[in-house]
Amino acid sequence: MAAKIRREDEVIVLAGKDKGKRAKVSQVLPTGKLILEGINLVKKHQKPNPQLGVAGGIVEKEAPIQASNVAIFNSATGKADRVGFRFEDGKKVRFFKSNSELVK
């Protein structure tokens, strides 16, 4: 099945502590979760590892967010939108359901 949200897509967070924020998808995980740039930051207590040259301390990192909690951002309308699929010239393409424009 083709993915409705892909890497480098701009999305809006629909639920959670970062609700309403826009971000770019940096990674799509096979478990149906996404990692967004600067969204869902958590503090991880990192243990030092001198063999790998990793310093210890409290590190902020991006945690995965469920794909159902985000919607793709339509720059033409300036709102969150839904994605559909259709065939054009024998290729399957994604389009916005509100205005039928292709997703870039």
From Swiss-Prot:
SMART domains recorded: KOW (SM00739)
Coiled-coil segments: none
Keywords from the UniProt entry: Ribonucleoprotein, Ribosomal protein, RNA-binding, rRNA-binding
GO cellular component, one term: ribosome
GO molecular function, one term: structural constituent of ribosome
A Pfam family annotated for this UniProt entry: KOW
InterPro entries per UniProt: KOW, Rib_uL2_dom2, Ribosomal_uL24, Ribosomal_uL24_CS, Ribosomal_uL24_KOW, Translation_prot_SH3-like_sf
Gene3D superfamilies in UniProt: 2.30.30.30
GO biological process, one term: translation
HAMAP family in the record: Ribosomal_uL24_B (MF_01326_B)
Task performed by this protein: One of two assembly initiator proteins, it binds directly to the 5'-end of the 23S rRNA, where it nucleates assembly of the 50S subunit.
Quaternary context: Part of the 50S ribosomal subunit.
Family stated for the protein in its record: Belongs to the universal ribosomal protein uL24 family.
Protein name: Large ribosomal subunit protein uL24
Organism: Shewanella sp. (strain W3-18-1)
Gene: rplX
